[in-house]
Curated annotation (Swiss-Prot):
<dbReference type="InterPro" id="IPR050357">
    <property type="entry name" value="Arrestin_domain-protein"/>
</dbReference>
<dbReference type="Pfam" id="PF00339">
    <property type="entry name" value="Arrestin_N"/>
</dbReference>
<comment type="similarity">
    <text>Belongs to the ART10 family.</text>
</comment>
<dbReference type="InterPro" id="IPR011021">
    <property type="entry name" value="Arrestin-like_N"/>
</dbReference>
<comment type="function">
    <text>May regulate endocytosis by recruiting RSP5 ubiquitin ligase activity to specific plasma membrane proteins in response to extracellular stimuli.</text>
</comment>
<protein>
    <recommendedName>
        <fullName>Arrestin-related trafficking adapter 10</fullName>
    </recommendedName>
</protein>
<keyword id="KW-0963">Cytoplasm</keyword>
<dbReference type="GO" id="GO:0005829">
    <property type="term" value="C:cytosol"/>
</dbReference>
<dbReference type="GO" id="GO:0031625">
    <property type="term" value="F:ubiquitin protein ligase binding"/>
</dbReference>
<keyword id="KW-0254">Endocytosis</keyword>
<dbReference type="GO" id="GO:0030674">
    <property type="term" value="F:protein-macromolecule adaptor activity"/>
</dbReference>
<dbReference type="InterPro" id="IPR014756">
    <property type="entry name" value="Ig_E-set"/>
</dbReference>
<dbReference type="GO" id="GO:0070086">
    <property type="term" value="P:ubiquitin-dependent endocytosis"/>
</dbReference>
<dbReference type="InterPro" id="IPR014752">
    <property type="entry name" value="Arrestin-like_C"/>
</dbReference>
Amino acid sequence: MSTTVRVVLDPPSNGEFYTLEDVIAGSVVLGLEKSVNIREVMVKLVGQSEAVVRPGDHLENEKPQSLQVPLSDNRSLHEVVKLESSVFPPENVKAAMKGSRKPFKVEKGEYKFPFEFHFPSRPQCIQRHQRKLFTYLKGRTNPKLPPSFNNLLSSKDVLNLNAYFYSLGCIEYFVEATVFTGGDEMWFKPFRSYPALKRTFEFIPSNVAQEHLEDALRENPNTPPQVFRSKFDVTFEGSEQQMWVEVRSKHLRSVYRLDYLFRPSGKKFNQVFLCMLNPLPESADLRVARVELNLIEVVTYLAGNRSNANLSSLRLAGVDTDYKVDLTKCQQTESGFTECHVELSDIYPLDMIRFNEEDYKHNGNRLYSFDSCNIRRRFKFQLFLHWTLNGVDHFQTEVLTNFTNIFCESVTVAEQPPDYMEEQLPKYE
C-alpha cells in the first residue's frame, strides 16, 4: 500500500496515564510512496462508555425481575468525549477555498501534522440524553468524566465465565486519524494498518481525588465516626453471652493508594472493638488467631433499563497470629455493653500494610471507583477476624463496610504543620 498513517502521542505528564490537566497532543505522520490527491486529514479524540447486558438474572430499573421469555442482549453506548480537528489543509487555506472540496496533490515523502485536544469538564453525551433515559449520572449536579476501564480486556481473550461477563463493559479513550482522498464521495482508511490509525490511551481524572481530599479536610472534627457492625452476633450454647465486632472510622469514606490501613495515623482499621453483652472474666484467654482484609469490587453494567452486577474479592491482607486480647482494659459503655479495643496494629506485619502499595491492576484496571452513564464501579472492605476462647471455642466475625471511594493516586497530608523556627537576621557591620 502506497500510503501509511501513524498517530504519535506526546507522553502524559506523570509518565503513566493522562489526566484532566494533560493536553492530548501529538501528530499524524503520513508517509507517501507516491503522490496522492488528499482532500483532508481529520483527527478525533473519542471517549466511549459501552455496556452489554446479557439475558439471565437481571434488574430492571434497579428492581429484580423474573424472566418469562428469553431476552436478547441489551447494548448501551455513550460518547462521553467527541472532539474533531482538521489538520490538513491549514485553516487559512480552507478559508481561501470558501467551501470548495477540491483535493490537493501531495508529493511523495513523509509529513507530520500536529494536533492537540483539551478534555471537556463533563461527559459530552449528557446534553444529548433523552429526558426519560435512566443513567447512573442522572441528577448529578457536577458529573465527571469516567476513567479508562477494560480498554485492554477483550471478551474474545478471556478464559473463564466470570472474566467474560466482566469484559462486557468498557470505557475507552482513543485518538483516531482519517485521511480523505479524491473527490467528495471517496475516503481512505487503510485497515491493514488500523492499530496505527487508532491510538488508545489510559485516562484517569485525577482531580477527583483532590476534590474528595479537600472535602475531608473541611469536615467538622466533631463529626462522629462511621460504625460498621459485624454481620452476625456470636452466641454460645448454654450461655447468655453475645459478642460482636465494631469498626469505627472517619476515614473509610475515601481511601487512597499507599494509605496505612491499620496504623493509628491511617485512621482506617485502628479502631476495632470486640463488644460483649456480658463482660468476660479477666482470666479468660481470648485470642485473635487470624486477620483477613479483602476488597470487594462491585461492577454494574446498565443497558436499556436492565443491569447486571459482577462481584470480585481481592485479598489485601491475610495474617496468622496469636494475639491475646487484654481483657483488663475492657470498658463499660453508656449503652450497657462491654467493649474491648483490639489493636490490630500491634500484629506484625499489619502495621506495615499500605493500601495497594504494588499499584495492582485487576483485569488490567487500576483500583478506582467511578460512575459513568452506564457503568458503575464500587468497592467495600471486608474484615474477617478468627477467634479462640479458652482454647476451646472457635468463632469468626465478619465486618462489611459501606461503599468506599477508592483512588489509585496517593496523597500525603501532614497531621500538623512543622514547628516554626525563628531565624536570626544576619548582622551587618
